Amino acid sequence: MVLVTDLDASLDFYCNKLGLVETNRKEFEAGRFTLVFLAAPGNLDSAKATRSPELELTYNWDPEDYDGGRNFGHLAYYVDDIYATCQRLMDAGVTINRPPRDGRMAFVRSPDNISIELLQEGDAQAPAEPWASMENTGSW
């Protein structure tokens, strides 16, 4: 579960930019929070049948600061093409904090500053530009 501060910005990032799909949403008016469940496109059948693997976003309606790592450490996802994924994210305005210089791994951050690790499915791709010479940006 990841606590988010802006549900719309988080859904834009996780769905429109990262490519996850919303599988379920529950509003809890009495508790004043919303749960949104997301899955990778390749895991939709499993997510709908067994609710796994899914990412749960929790949005508390009343503003709250999540300091001291209360919202999470980092998430990791396998992707079919690390270079194409990073290019798509950059084109969507996402900063690549740790570029995939090795053709295997990259890091980005969500709107709530959650570190997202992207891993190449299968063998690493051959190092390629512009990634091989791209510097780190910020931290991950």
For the regions a protein language model found, what residue spans apply to each?
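Core segments of cupin and vicinal oxygen chelate
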Residues: 1-52
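Short, well-ordered beta-strand elements within core beta-sheets of diverse protein domains
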Residues: 2, 75-77
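Vicinal oxygen chelate
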Residues: 23-26, 34-37, 77, 83-140
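Short glycine/serine/proline-enriched coil/turn segments at secondary-structure junctions
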Residues: 29-30, 65-67
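Short, charged, solvent-exposed linker or helix-capping segments at domain edges/interfaces
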Residues: 46-54, 68-69, 88, 119, ...
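Amide-forming acyltransferase catalytic core, primarily the GNAT-like/NAT-type
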Residues: 60-63
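Eukaryotic phosphotyrosine signaling hubs
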Residues: 70-74
